[in-house]
Amino acid sequence: MFLRHLLQNSQRIVVYLPAQKCHKGVIEAIQDKLHGQAQDAGFLKNLIYSGAIDICIDGLNEVTAETRAKICQFVESYFRGNIIMTTQPLEWTPPSTAKTYYLQPLEKQQIQEFLISRQPRLPKEAKIQGADYAQACTNYLTEVLNHQQAKEELDAVRRILSNPMDLTVVALMLSQGKHPNLFRLQEQQYNLMAAEYQQEWKQEFPLKRFSAAIYQMRLEDKQALPADEFHQVAMSLEDEKYKMVVSRQWQDEKGEAKKEWYFRHDKIMDFFLVQNFLGETDAAEGLLVDRMGDTRFRGVYFLLATLLPLDAAKELREDLIQYAADTKDNTVSNTFVQLLRTR
């Protein structure tokens, strides 16, 4: 959100790069965005070194240690450049020339104000609206931000309630008269959507089949949902009570209307991806090991910390710690351990 605000209001030339696009190098990632003479490496290097362009690199936590090292080396080499990088909490060594800023959790009043600000975007037929909705928000925050609970759990609650995506889900659920479970938000939202899916389409939500298709989609680095096969699913996910996906419409070269659906946030996609990792089948157990170093499935392991049976989660914790020791990459293991403690 901050980067979006920064880019929209900048008066300078800005290059936005997802960190995943920098696996070959930052200069190479910029070149891929340009055409003609502007692609010249020497020309680009002069622009960057002189501070003529700003560079935003987003999502360092979503890439391998090798890619992060390339980005850090670039930043240290162009120390006069205007470069901003973002990451979720991560154990790493920033470039020696970098200045670090930490986003602080929202205060209770700020969380309350955000929830109230969602009212105009809530479904028109929401069960709880107006003053009743405001009171529901107050009551809920008083309960979940109870200072009598363990500090670690309270810190985890504040982190979740400082995430606009999670807060929006909380607002939607409160407006429906539900009690959000902050540590299982996506699962809770899915259960509500699946129950309505069954009522509307007279059949169970095809969770296993849809999740397998999403896993394949992720492996192929595709973004659009396989809507040809799951049109009813896409329609239910897009319902304004859940807003789990968003759609984009356009006309093709023949003037025919086209429409595609995309997950509104990676956290929602991760919920469906994690279904492939759950259960006692050989396939599920194999994925737990095979995808451990795949940054595309980082969020899946965080969900596993809360969704796996406790003994299985503890076993996976040890495997992740061993993996981190072997690879010197603890981007997943540290957060997994913290999440597991909340249980």
Task: State where each predicted segment sits.
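C-terminal leucine-rich, beta-strand-based interaction scaffolds used for sensing/assembly
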Residues: 219-300, 313, 317-342
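Alpha-helix boundary/N-cap detector
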Residues: 128-136, 295, 311, 327
